[in-house]
Amino acid sequence: RVLLAEYTKIKYWKQLAALFGSLEDNKRELLALDLTYQQNGLDKEKQFVALAYQFMAIDVPYRAAAILERAMKEGQVEKTEKNLEILGSAYQRAQEFKKASPVLEQAAKLASHGNAWSRLAGVYLNLNENEKALVAAINALSKGGLKREDLTWMNRGSAEASLHCYDAAVKSFSKAAKFDRVKKNAVNWKKYVSAEGERRNKLIANGANLAQCKKV
């Protein structure tokens, strides 16, 4: 702190950030890193990514996204699958779904696993793009290696229900119900879509002109 009062060189902010990091003082490390960033003092990809992670950790995802996007545009952060997924995740958490979708689409095409596709399914559901959500969920499950397979099945079931594919949705929610983390919610959704499917089938049988399953 004495150094900072006497000197304004960027290297001192960097050193202070490293010191706070070694002491696991995350708040002060973030402050020092951010001040370094504002003075254009970050010059390594890992520094930009670390700063973005820190803003996400304190629930300021839009700031994290802005830092990463600018760094990518300026060539300071490579557009790898991992970095794109971090950027897309930041926009998703900031509820900037229209900005999240094209980024996650890029990440999904580069990834060997299905995690970006899984995130993309959730983003598409929030944009009410149910056909795309279903395709993304199917792709995620097909690629595998998922951190949250339970949520992927939930998103798939939600997309299928929105497309009036109730039998398929029942199967997806049954799959989701095998995971303790979402079991209660999945069982409730399974009951709802099963009942809704039966209700609509009866109405259609009696001559009602209702939308039917829209397969993708």
Where are these regions (language model features)?
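Alpha-solenoid helical repeat scaffolds
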Residues: 1-163, 168-171, 175-200, 206-216
